[in-house]
């Protein structure tokens, strides 16, 4: 089912779209007065974006607290200023990491909650301004770490030659997979950035429930066809 009602729409956000791009597009297409989302998904990521429509926006304060699931590809050996492939390369190393090293550290993160510092290139507000705006302006600022948790994970693949880890993660709200990539590499004295990211689930909503952005008008006007 693509939605619990006309108040909630689940979108498969395309890569290169910001979450706000999706919000504004949907608002225009269906002529809604109010549209909001239940958790920012980075432009370089795709997947589940939960939208509240009109009265549905009142549900977002609860939905944003939901745990989320991702499939990520992490590239070791190179760091970027944004912690993902969209950023500028900051540093690199020739040191190769092994699957044994990676597995051990992922298990360590899994065992306990840990304090994670969000990326400076993020949509978090710092004194009323979005952090990524300040970061682009090279303003010096700090983001307080937050307590996060990995509930479940699966190492899906590790390509030693390309130094790419593919991993699925089921995590608490506020968890930044970009920061996890950097934290993971740091623990094994290496560098890394997030290569790709798909949000596969947000609370009860899975990617199989999502519709494409091009389907929004048809969905809104023919909802029974999608239920």
Curated annotation (Swiss-Prot):
Highest taxon in the source lineage: Bacteria
Enzyme Commission number(s): 5.4.99.25
Pfam families according to UniProt: TruB_N (PF01509)
Listed InterPro entries: PsdUridine_synth_cat_dom_sf, PsdUridine_synth_N, tRNA_psdUridine_synth_TruB
Entry GO MF terms: RNA binding; tRNA pseudouridine(55) synthase activity
Active site: 42
Keywords: Isomerase, tRNA processing
Reactions catalysed: uridine(55) in tRNA = pseudouridine(55) in tRNA
Family: Belongs to the pseudouridine synthase TruB family. Type 1 subfamily.
Function summary: Responsible for synthesis of pseudouridine from uracil-55 in the psi GC loop of transfer RNAs.
PANTHER family, A to Z: PSEUDOURIDYLATE SYNTHASE TRUB1, TRNA-PSEUDOURIDINE SYNTHASE
Protein name: tRNA pseudouridine synthase B
Native source organism of the sequence: Ureaplasma parvum serovar 3 (strain ATCC 700970)
